[in-house]
Amino acid sequence: MKHCMRALLSAAAFVATHAQAADDCSFAKKVDLPSRRQVAVVSSGALEPCSTGSYAVRVYSTAHAAPGFDTDDYVTGVLHARDGTVADAFTADLGARAPQALVVTTRSAGSGGYVGAQAYVTTPRAVRLVASVDGLAPDADVKAALRQALGKRRSAR
């Protein structure tokens, strides 16, 4: 009985440690999109490994939101695969096609710490990926790389 109890406690400690480790690399951030009267919530996939998985972009309308209730009116969302951890989410002016883009950056788990980024634009009822870059140096200008990717995409049409 003593051995059984010890094994059970060890297993519980392992599970608790593993659950805590999964939370150490979680990411959740709310980003205001005032010109659209929206707010976006970017979060990494729950219970996924730190180094790979997914993240979600959920968009809510704030057009009729009371103070403190800006995530009540869900509009749309997308899931995106990730290679690395989500590092940040912010808005950036990426030019005429994406004047208030939602940018999500990731950092690889490997020794290089390479950076990736995706840019999204929203409409009243949709969120759309407009540019994506991967394998950037850790100190790269993410906004410039996304602007360049947008330009290449435009010239390919």
What residue spans do the PLM features occupy?
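N-terminal signal peptide c-region/cleavage motif recognized by signal peptidases
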Residues: A16-H18
